[in-house]
Amino acid sequence: TSDNSFVAEMQVTSRRPVYNSTYITTLINYRDTKFEFNYTPGESLDLSNITLSNNLVAVISFYSYVVIGLDFDSFSLNGGAPYFARAMEIANMAQSLNTKGWEPFSGKNDNRYDLAVALTDESSKAFHSFWYNYHRNGLDEMAANASRGRIRIIQAMADLQKLYDSRPSSPLLLIIGETKLDEIVRICSQATAEEKQAVKKQLNQIFPTKGYLINNLK
C-alpha cells in the first residue's frame, strides 16, 4: 500500500508421507486473506516470548506452530498440543497489533485467533482424536492392509461427526474439508455398498457445499 507497508494473501500448505508408501497426504491447505504487515529491508525479524511488535513475525510464527502441531498430532494422540498452545499465545499477544485476522471470536473461518481457539479448546478434542486415528491408524496401515486401514478411517469418522455436532462452524472442519474430503472419497470407493452410503450421508451433512465431490462415492 505504501513504502514498507504491504497487504497480501497467504496460502499455508503442509504435507506428510504415509508410512511404508510413496503416497503424500496433505495436512493443511489454508488461505489467509487478511495478511497486512510492515517491513523495512534489513530489518531483524525476531520472535519474543513476551511481546509482539511486527505482524509479519506474528503471522509466520503462528502458522509455523500450527503446521508443526498438525504434523505431530498425526503421529501421536494430542502430540501437537504444545505447539497449538504456543500458537494460542501468539494469537493473544497479537491483540496489541490491532491488525486484521486476529479479532477474537469473529466467527469467520479465515481468522487466526478463532483457529487457535479451535485447536486448543476442549470442545474440539474430537478433532485431535480423528486426526490421529485417521492418519496413524488409518492411512499408515493401508500399505500393509488396505482393508484394515480403510475400516479404521471409516471408524475415525465418528469423531468427525462429534466435532460437527459440537462445533458445526469450526474452522477445523474447513481444514478437513480442504485436505481430507477428496482423499476419504477415494479411499471409501473400495468400501462395501452399505459403508459407501453411510459415509456419503455423513459427509453430505457435515460438508453440504461439497456434494459435487462427495457424490462421486457410488
Tell where the protein language model's regions lie, with residue ranges:
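Compositionally biased, intrinsically disordered linkers/stalks adjacent to structured regions
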Residues: 33-83
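Short, well-structured alpha-helical interface segments that form or flank functional binding sites
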Residues: 5, 55, 59, 175
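Extended amphipathic alpha-helical interaction segments
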Residues: 64-174
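Short, solvent-exposed secondary-structure capping/transition elements
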Residues: 4, 21-22, 73-80, 189, ...
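A cross-kingdom marker for long, charged
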Residues: 139-218
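A mature extracytoplasmic/lumenal domain signature
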Residues: 12-14, 41
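Surface-exposed peri-terminal alpha-helical interaction modules
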Residues: 3, 30, 45-55, 144, ...
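Start-of-domain marker
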Residues: 1-11, 18-20, 27-29
